[in-house]
């Protein structure tokens, strides 16, 4: 799923932020994202899940919030892989979904959640990001 009103054709990104849930990129590195965009860099975000197991809000609310954050920050691209929240695996099928996004945008730099994080999805997401980048 892509955020509407963005031109995704032939979009080479300087930086691609990979996040387990909608709002992770904003909470973890929005200052960095804004700084990079102000420097003229093309920055995008790929959210792995819709955050459907989150205790605050619904997937629909999270989608609307991420679309609004995309506009406010001036992101050049944002996609959601719609992987099952809480239970996603770092397996071949999931890696290939992410590889498709990586090859589409050909980022020079990738940012992801920390490998060691209080939230288990963040660590799993970081490992998925690392593995997909090397396929």
Show which residues each predicted segment covers.
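Active-site rim/loop-helix segments in enzyme catalytic domains that contact anionic ligands
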Residues: 1-105
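Active-site adenylate/phosphate-handling loop in enzymes that bind or generate adenylated species
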Residues: 101-135
């Amino acid at each position: 799923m892509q955020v509407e009103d963005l031109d995704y054709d032939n979009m080479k990104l300087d930086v691609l932020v990979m996040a387990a849930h909608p709002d992770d990129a904003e909470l973890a590195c929005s200052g960095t994202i804004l700084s990079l965009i102000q420097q003229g860099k093309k920055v995008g975000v790929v959210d792995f899940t819709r955050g459907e197991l989150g205790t605050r809000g619904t997937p629909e609310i999270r989608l609307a919030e991420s679309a609004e954050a995309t506009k406010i920050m001036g992101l050049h691209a944002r996609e959601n892989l719609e992987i099952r929240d809480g239970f996603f695996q770092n397996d071949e099928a999931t890696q290939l979904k992410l590889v498709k996004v990586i090859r589409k945008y050909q980022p020079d730099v990738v940012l992801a959640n920390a490998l060691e994080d209080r939230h288990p999805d963040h660590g799993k997401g970081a490992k998925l990001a690392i593995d997909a980048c090397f396929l």
